[in-house]
Regions:
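Solvent-exposed, polar/charged alpha-helical surfaces in well-ordered, non-transmembrane soluble domains
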Residues: 103, 107, 139, 143, ...
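N-terminal hydrophobic or amphipathic helices and topogenic motifs
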Residues: 2-136, 142, 359-438
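Short, glycine-/small- and polar/acidic-enriched structural segments
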Residues: 50-242, 255-258, 262-268, 285-288
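Secondary-structure end/capping motifs
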Residues: 307-394
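Periplasmic peptidoglycan-binding/tethering modules of Gram-negative envelope proteins
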Residues: 398-482, 490-506, 532, 554, ...
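Second-shell loop/turn segments in exported
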Residues: 92-93, 127-128, 166, 194-200, ...
Length: 567
């Protein structure tokens, strides 16, 4: 099995003078002494150390070789100053990580090394040298040390204006490589409130869980160690150097009698291994197999792109051609990908099964926002802005990164004319069963005309709420939504006083029907607004006042949206 890895963000490390280092060392020693005093010297009246860590040691549960959390970066990453990349010997340097999704680039190049027989050399007259790095290469690209690199769309929102790059191409979608693993008893994203997960900062690991939590209405707290607890109702995140190590940390905690982690956000195959070796304590809550919000894109140094547009056009054309060969002729081309990464061909096929390599029409729909079976560039970018919240102080316009002229030029020449958008659900079960637990639930207060099931067309919020529900169905092929209508129970006691339990039962039936009609009105509004939406992916029921969400009657007048995804 391969060791699938994605980028690890570089962390800023301050450099000090020798005197500063001495002072730092003295302060460090002093803090250790103070910590020892607080840990061992301060005891309650029963003589038990107040520190959770100390009590764990006394219970015979030392951390041993458990991975240590990292200090989280406050704010967003800081990149090196922008500079223009200059090709050397007519050869472009491109950096990637060990990921099958970049196989199209490797196929087009005929391997990693500069190749006179590559698609790039034969069709456009330049060569490409592909390097691999375990760390993010945003700074080397920005600073002109790379012509291009691969990153994910969500990261662009975090990097913002300082990232002087052009995005001319979507490489593909991750489909099943990213996964959230949790304690066996956790049934939905909503139930992650007050729990703690291990993750990796500023990559798709963090974005994936932030995206899910934001959609479920669960706020995020960033924790600095395992003994810290999130704010009430929040999901706590503890960061590690990479998502593999985050899963190692969760696996270690599962061996303790009182685990301090409730799960991890990581990458296959490590996530699968954690579940398999947990003795039934852990399970996969969700993967991105049918939740297409992790989209890899090609990032090109902006100064280089402006000076050498023909080379950028060649990169775009070559990667699309490599993607075509891997999609349509995998057997003939998989060997070069396996060799480049040191995989067996069986492992390469397994890794490619977790990737959707994008073609030309899928690219154009991705950037235009018209793709209806996966996340779009603008949609994922804005989801990242919303998910990171206050971390991103001054969000930028996603359009500043995009240049679709290269894709448009290829389409204008009639290239790849036979290709179609072909993103289908990957089914491991017959459908997204409404009998099980939803991935997440979201309460939405649609506005209706008084005492009726007619949506208030004058309320602008209703259109936004419809967009929210449609977004669920768009980014997740094969998923379904259950609309559960609710009304408030404010007058139940009044009905009881007027006519006893008989009147209460009668009015309860009317409330049930009104709530059903309201959920049907939402369903009908969705299918009216989004013509391509399959009505079979929507189900509507009424629950009347049977399931109040709050003592506040206003909050009980709602449509609960339950999202069921295929796994």
């Amino acid at each position: 099995m391969t060791s699938y890895r994605r980028r690890i963000p570089q962390r800023n490390r301050a450099r000090g003078s020798a005197a500063g280092n001495v002072i730092t060392l003295l302060l460090f020693v002093g803090l250790i002494a103070l910590g020892a005093y607080l840990l061992l010297g301060k005891k309650d009246e029963n003589g038990t150390a107040r520190s959770e860590s100390a009590s764990a040691v006394q219970r015979g549960e030392p951390d041993g070789d458990a991975p240590a959390p990292i200090e989280p970066v406050d704010g967003t990453p800081t990149l090196e100053a922008a500079a223009t990349y200059e090709p050397k010997d007519n050869t472009l340097q491109i950096d990637i990580s060990e990921y099958a999704g970049y196989g199209g680039l490797i196929v087009a190049n005929g391997g990693l090394e500069p190749n006179p027989d590559s698609f790039f050399a034969k069709e456009y007259g330049f060569k490409v040298k592909i390097t691999q790095s375990e760390h993010e290469t945003w700074s080397p690209l920005n600073n002109g040390r790379l012509a291009a690199t691969a990153t994910t769309t969500d990261a662009l929102a975090v990097l913002g204006r300082q990232f002087d790059a052009v995005i001319p191409l979507q490489i593909g979608y991750s489909r099943g490589a990213d996964m959230v693993v949790v304690d066996r008893g956790i049934a939905s994203v909503n139930q992650l409130a007050d729990k703690v997960l291990a993750a990796s900062q500023f990559n798709e690991s963090e974005f994936f869980i932030r995206y899910l939590a934001q959609e479920a209405g669960v706020p995020i707290s960033i924790l600095r160690d395992l003994d810290a607890r999130p704010e009430a109702g929040h999901l706590g995140l503890v960061f590690y150097d990479d998502a593999f190590i985050a899963c190692d940390a969760y696996a270690h905690e599962l061996t303790r009698s009182s685990p301090r982690l409730n799960g991890c956000v990581g990458w296959t195959p490590r996530t699968d291994e954690v579940v398999e070796k947990s003795a039934g304590k852990a399970k996969a809550l969700v993967s991105n197999r049918n939740l297409l919000v992790i989209a890899d894109v090609l990032a090109v140094n902006k100064g280089f792109a402006k000076a050498h547009p023909d080379m950028v056009r060649g990169l775009v054309h070559g990667i699309l051609e490599g993607n075509r060969r891997l999609r349509d002729q995998q057997a003939q081309n998989i060997g070069v990908v396996a060799k480049a990464f040191g995989w067996s061909e069986a492992d390469a096929r397994n890794e490619l099964s977790r990737v959707h390599l994008s073609n030309l029409p899928e690219n154009r729909a991705f950037f235009a926002g018209t793709i209806d079976s996966a996340g779009s560039f603008g949609g994922i970018f804005q989801s990242s802005v919303l998910s990171y919240g206050s971390v991103i102080k001054n969000p930028t316009d996603p359009a500043r990164f995009v240049d679709t002229s290269f894709l448009d030029a290829l389409a204008g020449k009639g290239l790849f004319a036979e290709q179609k958008i072909a993103i289908a659900p990957i089914k491991t079960s017959t459908n997204a069963s409404l009998e099980g637990d939803p991935l997440l639930s979201k309460d939405i207060r649609f506005f209706f005309e008084p005492n009726s099931a007619v949506l208030d067309r004058s309320a602008p919020q209703n259109a936004e709420y419809l967009d929210t529900i449609n977004r669920f169905l768009t980014v997740s092929p094969g998923s379904t939504v259950l609309l559960r209508g609710h009304v408030d129970n404010a007058r139940v006691n009044e009905f009881r006083e007027q006519g006893g339990e008989q009147l209460v039962k009668s009015m309860a039936l009317k409330a049930m029907e009104l709530s059903r009609q309201r959920s049907l009105a939402v369903r009908d509004a969705l299918t009216e607004k989004y013509k391509k939406l399959d009505v079979s992916r929507l189900e509507a029921v009424g629950r009347g006042w049977e399931e109040p969400a709050s003592p506040d009657s206003n909050l009980n007048r709602r449509v609960e949206v339950q999202w069921f995804t295929l796994e």
